[in-house]
């Protein structure tokens, strides 16, 4: 009798632990997969953090393992390697509120500080200029880096500045940020140009000619459509999700997702909870409305307004975004556009909160484990990790080689209305 009871107990223990064992198996597979096909992240904001926290001074800064990491920076070399990273597009972002000349200077400063940071770790990091250089660097076990300029305001309507950025390692430029430029409409501003203005088309032409990827995150749906019409090379969304899953205008409508295959677009999925979780997006809207209400009911009394808002927050706790919800965006993009058009664009170090399980790059294997659990093949996951974005960049380089044989650098000059 005792041996039957013992056998039954073992069966119960095995049954109870088998889901955890299965999850551990998915995670182990994800880690092994990323060791072979490391993640290239389309958008990480380390340069912005270096500006805001250190005024671009690197003396005494240890990027291998940043102390107090959870409370400040998401990213360092230790966590990138733990997450199976092989490469990053380092975002060189400056606020849209800067004056035009100051924005150009500040962007050059962002480029400079990131290049200096990479140079401090030659055994672990390298700046790549091409897809082939990226593959070679990753084979050496290094974190390869490209630069990405976040917002066309950074060039102050100058194709010459755009070319200077390319020469310094910038391999994509986001056409707008949260505000319109003089030549393109943003997703989060009232339209001024009905999409892409004539000079914006010249910007896209010149980016194609150089081999710089056109990034249409942050832009309006009409600007997205216009960029797809104009560009003869693959474009990207460096950090955006699916609008059908989260209704933010920062995400991509299905009508645009359906066009991704024709252009070779890669939509690199963002981790910002407000763009991932519809519940978080709605909470953010309600919180903003409640904050305005508290201020209007307590004019001039900031303490009373803050207390009222704190009471509302306590009664209405912020929902959490999850790894599973990020995977839902990937599922939807795969359904509409196909597996060849998905990547990862976390926005780490540019966001204040993150989905549970994706608190920093070391958690990214959790996302790939979730995809494997949902039935994605390892070949599918390898495309999402780095295959798709390297393919898009290589195709853009091929287009550029042809265009450079056919035409000289663009000489268009912006003319204000």
Where are these regions (language model features)?
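Positively charged n-region of N-terminal signal peptides that target proteins for export
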Residues: 1-4
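Bacterial N-terminal signal peptides
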Residues: 7-16
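N-terminal hydrophobic targeting/anchoring segments and the immediately downstream early-domain regions
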Residues: 21-194, 247-417
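Histidine-centered catalytic micro-motifs
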Residues: 39-46, 219, 237-241
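Alpha-helix-loop-beta-strand connector modules within alpha/beta enzyme cores
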Residues: 118, 192-210, 227-237, 370
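Distinct, well-ordered alpha-helical segments
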Residues: 158-162, 223-233
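Short, contiguous, pocket-lining structural segments
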Residues: 192-199, 215-220, 252
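Substrate-binding cleft of carbohydrate-active enzyme catalytic domains
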Residues: 203-216, 222-226, 256-262, 332
């Amino acid at each position: 009798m005792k041996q039957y009871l013992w056998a039954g107990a073992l069966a119960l223990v095995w049954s109870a632990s088998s889901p955890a064992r299965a999850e551990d198996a998915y995670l182990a597979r994800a880690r092994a997969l990323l060791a072979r096909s490391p993640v290239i992240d389309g958008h990480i904001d380390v340069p912005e953090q270096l500006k805001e926290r250190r005024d671009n001074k690197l003396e005494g800064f240890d990027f291998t393992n940043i102390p107090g990491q959870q409370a400040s920076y998401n990213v360092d070399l230790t966590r990138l390697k733990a997450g199976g990273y092989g490469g990053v597009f380092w975002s060189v972002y400056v606020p849209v509120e800067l004056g035009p000349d100051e924005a150009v200077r500040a962007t050059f400063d962002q480029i400079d500080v990131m290049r200096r940071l990479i140079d401090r770790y030659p055994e672990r990091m390298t700046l790549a200029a091409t897809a082939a250089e990226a593959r070679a660097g990753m084979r050496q076990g290094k974190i390869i880096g490209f630069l990405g300029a976040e917002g066309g305001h950074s060039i102050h309507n100058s194709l010459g500045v755009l070319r200077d950025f390319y020469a310094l390692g910038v391999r994509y430029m986001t056409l707008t940020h949260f505000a319109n430029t003089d030549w393109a409409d943003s997703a989060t501003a009232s339209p001024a140009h009905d999409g892409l203005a004539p000079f914006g088309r010249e910007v896209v032409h010149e980016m194609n000619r150089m081999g710089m990827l056109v990034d249409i995150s942050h832009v309006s749906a009409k600007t997205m459509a216009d960029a797809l019409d104009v560009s003869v090379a693959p474009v990207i969304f460096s950090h955006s999700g699916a609008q059908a899953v989260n209704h933010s205008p920062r995400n991509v409508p299905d009508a645009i997702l359906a066009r991704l295959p024709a252009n070779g677009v890669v939509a690199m999925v963002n981790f910002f909870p407000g763009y991932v979780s519809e519940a978080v997006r709605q909470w953010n809207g309600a919180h903003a409305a409640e904050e305005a209400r508290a201020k209007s009911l307590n004019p001039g009394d900031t303490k009373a307004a803050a207390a009222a808002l704190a009471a509302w927050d306590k009664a209405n706790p912020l929902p959490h975004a999850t790894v599973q919800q990020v995977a839902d965006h990937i599922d939807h993009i795969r359904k509409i556009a196909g597996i060849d058009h998905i990547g990862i664009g976390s926005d780490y170090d540019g966001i204040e909160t993150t989905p549970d399980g994706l608190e920093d790059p070391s958690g990214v294997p959790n996302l790939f484990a979730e995809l494997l659990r949902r039935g994605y093949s390892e070949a599918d996951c390898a495309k999402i990790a780095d295959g798709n974005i390297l393919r898009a960049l290589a195709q853009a380089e091929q287009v550029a080689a042809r265009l450079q044989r056919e035409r000289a650098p663009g000489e268009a000059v912006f003319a204000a209305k």
